């Protein structure tokens, strides 16, 4: 009888961790979908949307799956960052508070806003400016080697996938200037990876603190 109680008690933390992981992933998914819709609204001003504007009013849009893919990617990235930190034995401790995370989100949205509102002389100037802003975002809110490496990897992979989808006619940008889109897309993906990574790390740290406090009370 006592052994059964011990097994049941020991399985509770594992079950709680799985439920917390699912909840964290769901929150990251919702944040990713929300940011995808917000950033699309910013790009509408230049007619360079990643998916047609009517997706906001109809789930039956031809590209309804794009914000869902963004949400899924956001969840994967947000869960991956703290896992990589633990695997490398380098827990991220730089600016670990919610105010810093919110500022990171604001800067990320600001970078997207700049790509939509500011008129640059040419695409090269746009690329260099956004690249500098994206690296500045990493330096200000992350500064970890794992964050930089994952950000670059995410930028390369996401840009490659998006271009393959366009070339294969799965969906297309509404902008006539395709070079303009390619000049800002990698930087946006990089900054987005850093932003979702910071959110994921903060959620994981908050969850870990809650579990520690609960274990102390028990």
Swiss-Prot record:
Source taxon at top rank: Eukaryota
Membrane-related topology note: Multi-pass membrane protein
Pfam families noted in UniProt: INSIG
Lumenal side: 45-63, 120-122, 169-182
GO biological process: cellular response to insulin stimulus; cholesterol biosynthetic process; SREBP signaling pathway; SREBP-SCAP complex retention in endoplasmic reticulum
Compartments where found: Endoplasmic reticulum membrane
Cytoplasmic topological domain residue ranges: 1-21, 82-96, 142-146, 201-218
Protein name: Insulin-induced gene 2 protein
Organism for this UniProt entry: Xenopus laevis
Gene name in the database record: insig2
């Amino acid at each position: 009888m006592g052994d059964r109680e011990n097994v049941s008690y020991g399985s509770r933390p594992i079950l709680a961790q799985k439920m917390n992981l699912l909840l964290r992933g769901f929150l990251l998914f919702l944040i990713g979908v929300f940011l995808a819709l917000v950033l699309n609204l910013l790009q509408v001003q230049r007619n360079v949307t990643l998916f047609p504007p009517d997706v906001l009013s109809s789930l039956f849009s031809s590209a309804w799956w794009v914000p869902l893919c963004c949400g899924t990617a956001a969840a994967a990235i947000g869960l991956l960052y703290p896992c990589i930190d633990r695997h490398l034995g380098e827990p991220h401790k730089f600016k670990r508070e919610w105010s810093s995370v919110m500022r990171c989100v604001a800067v990320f949205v600001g970078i997207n806003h700049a790509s939509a509102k500011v008129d640059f002389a040419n695409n090269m100037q746009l690329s260099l400016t956004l690249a500098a802003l994206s690296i500045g975002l990493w330096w200000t809110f992350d500064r970890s080697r794992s964050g930089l490496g994952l950000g670059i990897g995410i930028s390369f992979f996401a840009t490659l996938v998006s271009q393959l989808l366009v070339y294969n006619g799965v969906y297309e940008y509404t902008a006539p200037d395709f070079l303009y889109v390619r000049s800002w897309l990698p930087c946006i993906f990089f900054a987005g990876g850093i932003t979702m990574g910071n959110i994921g790390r903060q959620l994981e740290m908050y969850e870990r603190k809650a579990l520690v406090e609960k274990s102390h009370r028990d």
